[in-house]
Design a protein with these regions (language model features):
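Short, structured "edge-of-domain" segments at secondary-structure transitions
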Residues: 1-200
Length: 200
């Protein structure tokens, strides 16, 4: 509607928040404009000839990697953003902690991409009524309440969201509506389980 803001997140833990009006309307075949300046691999540097201005609030991450955009989030009027890293750590941060900037900058730190955390896998807009689903490359799936994830500032490393096995990494995160299970349905489920155990 021309009045919303969006946030781009890179795998090196950076985020940039800007107005949708910063990206002009273009046709389907157009290349588009730079939303966020990412760290390029050595082979790509010579091809990067654009001259967009970097963000004044640019900060460095701990991991020295070629980066890519991993998430685009429409900024809610109120609420938070949950970031999840490859090694199963994450946190939720108020959207107000992210300053609005012009597009094309390097962004600010959204989560520390330390050796412990690994790269940023994804970010989602949440509030305390939502739940979060996390999945690993080994098929491990965890669903948890967003309110149970620690709420911290941008520069924090976060807490463990999912316990992973050796060489297993987190590959996806998504916010879902909370599902309330009525007590009578839960009791019936427990009774059925107990009967099954007795029969065995």
């Amino acid at each position: 509607d021309g009045e919303q803001q969006s946030m781009l997140f890179s795998n090196e833990g950076k985020a940039i928040r800007c107005s949708e009006t910063d990206a002009r309307v273009m046709g389907r075949t157009a290349k588009g404009v730079r939303g966020m300046r990412v760290t390029l691999a050595a082979a790509q540097v010579e091809d990067d000839v654009e001259t967009d201005t970097d963000s004044e609030d640019e900060e460095s991450s701990d991991l020295n990697v070629a980066s890519r955009i991993v998430s685009l989030v429409v900024v809610p009027e109120t609420g938070e953003v949950l970031c999840a890293s490859a090694n199963g750590y994450g946190k939720r941060t108020p959207v107000d902690d992210f300053p609005t900037k012009k597009r094309g900058g390097k962004g600010v730190i959204a989560i520390k991409t330390s050796e412990r955390n690994g790269e940023l896998v994804g970010a989602v807009a949440i509030d305390v009524t939502k739940e979060v689903m996390l999945i690993s490359d080994g098929g491990t799936l965890v669903r948890t309440r967003a309110s149970e994830v620690a709420r911290t500032g941008r520069n924090a490393q976060g807490v463990r969201l999912i316990r992973l096995g050796n060489e297993e990494i987190l590959v996806g995160v998504v916010a879902v509506e909370a599902v309330e299970v009525e007590d009578d349905i839960l009791d019936a489920s427990i009774e059925t389980t107990e009967e099954t155990v007795v029969d065995e």
